[in-house]
Amino acid sequence: EIKEVGSKWKDQFKPGDKFSIQPALNYEGGPAGLLSAPGYSYRYAGGDATYIIIPSDVMEMGCLLHYNGPGFYPASLSEPLACVIGAMHACYHTHPGSYVHQMEIKDGGKMALLAGVGPMGLAMINYVLRREDRKPSLFVVTDIDQARLDRAATLYTKEFAASRGIDLRYVNTGTVENPVETLREISGGTGYDEVIVMAPVPAVVEQGDDIL
């Protein structure tokens, strides 16, 4: 919530306004160049601070956004959800002999989400199942924590996925002898059009590479 507004911006903001900051400023003049981000790069805008001074870079780049939602919690999800949506849109495919990058997931393709039932993974599942413009025909979600897999399966059921035209499978790769072989068998031996890895674990990254 905005507490005070300087004279330069009083025509656009007022005390009591709720707001959200778009953190990807893409501003070369920031303290860390293009990678500068509120919460990390600015002296008076720390991520753990109770009160902050909005950096002038944020204001000049138009990255202080009005928020008119019911509370702070939904607004706090905008950045992680943007990461999920951006990851989907950043997927691309190529064909031998061509340098053309076909952006986006393959409509009707096969997708695997590895280590996929943490908070960001759940957001990814939600987005995949609810997209209107394109969706996979097979969507395999893995983890090694059965309790978290079970919870994901109650939040996003196979029945709901089927109603959206998606064959959703939850797989505990910690209970199978050869996860790569198991996942390739589920794909029908073809591998997956998209593999998204949600944990920076070398073995899981290698799994992802092996099932593409």
Predicted features by range, described:
Residues 1-28, 46, 58, 65-67:
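Glycine-rich beta-strand-centered segment in the early N-terminal region that forms part
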Residues 11-13, 74-80, 104-105:
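Residue-level "contact hotspot" at macromolecular interaction interfaces
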Residues 122:
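Residues forming the Rossmann-fold NAD(P)(H) cofactor-binding site
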Residues 212:
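Helix-to-beta-strand junctions that scaffold the AdoMet/dcAdoMet cofactor pocket
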